[in-house]
Amino acid sequence: EADRQVLMVLLWGDRWPEIARHEPQQPTSPFRAPDVLLQVVDATALERDLELSLELSLLGRPLVIALNRMDEAREKGIYVNARALSERLGVPVVATVAHMGMGLTDLFAAALAAAREQACPLAQQCSEHIRESLKPLNAILARPEIEEAFRVPRPLLLMQLAENDDWFLRELAEHFPAVVPEVTAARAEAQRTLPRPLSDELHADRHHRAALLYETVTRLGAPEDTERWKRWLDELFLHPRGGLIGSLAVFALVLFMVFEVSAVLDG
């Protein structure tokens, strides 16, 4: 239920389509759908987060990916090609080390540019055998009256109905009851051509595509030989609270040295 509410906000903001006007939890305050989506992914566990990236690409919203914890990934011998990932997904990918503030300026600039340009991610399609099995269902959903009623990208609507989403099926049955038998038959035909239940096949395919993408944009090698003392100083002086204390300590040390040297010279 919570996931569905989040999805509705991401898709429509407070301007819900007619099919959702009867929902009991209507928006209580005016707000727009987001101009841009910002996904923070963990570079040390990238494969897991890429599955969500594939799902977000279906929403038809500009997307920016923050590739965080890049320093820790390199220390573990994981080297991510941010440019290759950006090209494959069709979205800006910005390398960041958030706790040190590194890359945040570039990240906000990329998000602002994406919101202004309204450039959506490249369509991340299912594997060919699934696309073939879903062609009849996709043809049904291509009807203008259905697209107008739901006001969502067709690839997203196709995935929701293919995965047998309760809410989308219920709304389809309420507003287009004559279409439901066709959708049911198309799902059954698609499932007949696949080796496992359709929803399981879609989940496995998404996991497989994320794994392939991960292998394409990453390289495993020797852990980066970083100088620990430099990293310790970075963490100290870039810390939101400890940085001030460290800076004051250095300033006090400089003053002490100046006065000591002056005293020696005067003597």
What are these regions (language model features)?
Residues 59, 87, 152, 227, ...:
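Short flexible coil/turn linkers enriched for glycine and charged/polar residues
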Residues 236-267:
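Core alpha-helical transmembrane segments of integral membrane proteins
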Residues 89, 206, 210-213, 229-237, ...:
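Hydrophobic alpha-helical segments of integral membrane proteins
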Residues 106, 205, 209, 228, ...:
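Generic recognition of stable, solvent-exposed alpha-helical segments in well-folded globular domains
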